[in-house]
């Protein structure tokens, strides 16, 4: 393991060890590259997958998911506030602080996938700059949806990172990432995005491919709530209240219904950790994950050794 990656891997392994639960890039930014890649490069028309609770052909899911996020792009923060009762902001801060970007003497290259609005990327750069004095670490924001990327690009103009060379927005499919070379990334992050992908094992395979040896994969995603009475209360809120809020916030109840259903269909933390391990990663700590807010969300971390 390189001298750069070893401290990061050790930090994450030590930082997550024993934690079961808690109360809870380089082109100029002015040119947002829309380099599109699609899973439709291969014929999947004979295979079915889930879109929320519905079964749909695999080659249709990508289009359906794109429509959802195009619909909610301008209200994305409000959507996350509704789905997490506002706690997603704290979760994201925890997520980034666990990674501690910029903690190396060598600038890092970080890939944030499904991060079109820039929310995680800006937090990463703020942490690297303000906590670690690192003004050279860069983030590539990759998202399949140009509407989400447009939101991120617009927001970047209000940050110190606009036109700085430290952040880049590109349109990429998480299952392909053909613009990202092998063994080129120090950290790979994905927040509230992987459950919307058609083939999660392919996403994990690509994450493993692009990471350097010693590189870190970290995923923040909704998970399974516990104990059972709280889980049922949260489920009732999700299925009865959230679609109504979707109508009020974005004039779109159907997109919110899908997002709730996608959470319900996503594997529990232990199962997802096994998927990460099966992709070749070494799980950080005892379990490879940390649950937040009684399991509403979880942080999963793996290391490419």
Swiss-Prot record:
Sequence positions that bind S-adenosyl-L-methionine: 117, 143, 173-174
Subcellular location: Mitochondrion inner membrane
EC number(s) on file: 2.1.1.201
InterPro entries: SAM-dependent_MTases_sf (IPR029063), UbiE/COQ5_MeTrFase (IPR004033), UbiE/COQ5_MeTrFase_CS (IPR023576)
Top EC class, one word: transferase
Record pathway: Cofactor biosynthesis; ubiquinone biosynthesis
Gene Ontology MF annotations: 2-methoxy-6-polyprenyl-1,4-benzoquinol methyltransferase activity
Keywords per UniProt: Membrane, Methyltransferase, Mitochondrion, Mitochondrion inner membrane, S-adenosyl-L-methionine, Transferase, Transit peptide, Ubiquinone biosynthesis
Reactions this protein catalyses: 2-methoxy-6-(all-trans-decaprenyl)benzene-1,4-diol + S-adenosyl-L-methionine = 5-methoxy-2-methyl-3-(all-trans-decaprenyl)benzene-1,4-diol + S-adenosyl-L-homocysteine + H(+)
Function, in words: Methyltransferase required for the conversion of 2-decaprenyl-6-methoxy-1,4-benzoquinol (DDMQH2) to 2-decaprenyl-3-methyl-6-methoxy-1,4-benzoquinol (DMQH2).
Family listed: Belongs to the class I-like SAM-binding methyltransferase superfamily. MenG/UbiE family.
Name of this protein: 2-methoxy-6-polyprenyl-1,4-benzoquinol methylase, mitochondrial
Species, as recorded: Schizosaccharomyces pombe (strain 972 / ATCC 24843)
């Amino acid at each position: 393991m390189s001298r750069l990656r070893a401290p990061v891997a050790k930090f994450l392994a030590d930082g997550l060890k024993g934690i079961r639960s808690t109360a809870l890039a380089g082109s100029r930014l002015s040119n947002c590259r829309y380099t599109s890649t699609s899973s439709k490069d291969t014929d999947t028309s004979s295979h079915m997958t889930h879109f929320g609770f519905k079964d749909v052909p695999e080659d249709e899911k990508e289009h359906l998911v794109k429509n959802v996020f195009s619909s909610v792009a301008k209200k994305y923060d409000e959507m996350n506030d509704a789905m997490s009762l506002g706690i997603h902001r704290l979760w994201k801060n925890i997520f980034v602080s666990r990674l501690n970007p910029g903690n190396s003497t060598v600038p890092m290259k970080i890939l944030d996938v499904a991060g079109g609005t820039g929310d995680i990327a800006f937090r990463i750069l703020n942490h690297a700059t303000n906590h670690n004095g690192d003004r050279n670490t860069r983030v590539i924001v990759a998202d399949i949806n140009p509407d989400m990327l447009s939101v991120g690009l617009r927001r970047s103009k209000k940050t110190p990172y606009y036109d700085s060379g430290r952040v880049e927005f590109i349109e990429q499919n998480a299952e392909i990432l053909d613009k990202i070379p092998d063994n080129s990334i120090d950290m790979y992050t994905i927040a509230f995005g992987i459950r919307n992908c058609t083939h999660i094992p392919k996403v994990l395979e690509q994450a493993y491919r692009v990471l350097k040896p010693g590189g870190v994969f970290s995923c923040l995603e909704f998970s399974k709530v516990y104990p059972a009475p709280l889980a049922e209360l949260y489920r009732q809120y999700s299925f009865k209240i959230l679609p109504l809020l979707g109508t009020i916030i974005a004039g779109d109840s159907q997109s919110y219904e899908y997002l709730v259903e996608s959470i319900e269909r996503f594997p529990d933390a232990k199962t997802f950790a096994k998927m990460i391990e099966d992709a070749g990663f070494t799980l950080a700590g005892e379990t490879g994950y940390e649950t937040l807010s009684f399991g509403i969300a979880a942080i999963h971390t793996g290391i490419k050794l």
